Amino acid sequence: MSNLENLQTQILADIAASSDEAALEAVRVGALGKKGSISALLATLGKMDPEQRKTEGAAINLAKEAVTQALTARRDLLKAAALDAKLAAETIDVTLPLREPLAEQGRIHPLSQVWDELTAIFADMGFAIAEGPDIETDDNNFTRLNFPEGHPAREMHDTFYFNPKEDGSRLLLRTHTSPVQVRTMLSQRPPIRVICPGRTYRSDSDQTHTPMFHQVEGLVIDKGSHLGHLKWILAEFCKAFFEVDNVNMRFRPSFFPFTEPSLEVDIQCRRGNGEIRFGEGEDWLEILGCGMVHPNVLTACGIDPEVYQGFAWGMGIDRIAMLKYGMADLRQLFEADSRWLNHYGFKPLDIPSLAGGLSS
């Protein structure tokens, strides 16, 4: 083995043995620096005859290239190892909020929490989420839903209307989320299985009513849908939402223009000491309305009622939030009181899931 080969082998061994970047830099200077061993060999080329310079120069440059590549590879390896060691030493994940912060921290509003709880429950049953605009047409909000002209819900004291257009038509703030069901039936063919959460508006304000409130409605359209399916869905929802093992429900005849038959649903509960406990007791509490979709509604939305049938239900998100979490006044939900929110709000990581617990 020639002296050049011995030198190259020794330098490569020193590179491999370098334990940090400082040691590696010392090897680089010793080999390729101004007074380095390979630099010294390159300086001797000027004293050689042309033929020898050609041969020796090629060999020295090959050795220099091998050393340079080894230095680069070792430097990258040492940098990666240093970064891994630094990351391993830094145990704080700055991307996550603290569960018990030292400073005051914001809270998730109970309405947002309940909205997520509803979504988690119905998503587990295979429902998609459908959304629509708050500003609606009279056609979608009333006419296609079998509200005849002169129905009380069309009166000014119930509905927020915009100024009439030149053609006499008027837009309005939707009074329920049922227009989303209309838009869904107009835009897609059965089978349909959706929930429609959102803001709704009616001209009313007291301890249990606000001009703007939140609803969630559900819609199922298929060839074999019947009331038995509806009762099962509502029972499973109530058990999951109120986090009880069993729930008794009472279905009472009622009237809604868009369903036939129409039903109101009560849930068994026990009242006492300022609390409501579900799944036990001898009291009953109304929680929602439901029924089979009226054939006139199906026809108005382009669905043949001789082939398909379906059911729908609706409930106030604000109301069921108050029932579950013991809030007395609906208006407090919208007053932006930080003290109230600190009491009833949720921590940022309290994400509802059926596996982990909705309100844990």
Swiss-Prot record:
Mg(2+) binds at residue 260. Transmembrane segments: none annotated. PROSITE patterns: AA_TRNA_LIGASE_II. One of its GO terms (biological process) is phenylalanyl-tRNA aminoacylation. One of its GO terms (cellular component) is cytoplasm. Its main location: cytoplasm. Gene3D superfamilies: Bira Bifunctional Protein, Domain 2. Its cofactor is Mg(2+). Its EC number is 6.1.1.20. Keywords: Aminoacyl-tRNA synthetase, ATP-binding, Cytoplasm, Ligase, Magnesium, Metal-binding, Nucleotide-binding, Protein biosynthesis. It is found in: Cytoplasm. One of its GO terms (molecular function) is tRNA binding. It catalyses: tRNA(Phe) + L-phenylalanine + ATP = L-phenylalanyl-tRNA(Phe) + AMP + diphosphate + H(+). Binds 2 magnesium ions per tetramer. Belongs to the class-II aminoacyl-tRNA synthetase family. Phe-tRNA synthetase alpha subunit type 1 subfamily. Tetramer of two alpha and two beta subunits. This is Phenylalanine--tRNA ligase alpha subunit. It comes from Rhodopseudomonas palustris (strain BisB5). The gene is pheS.
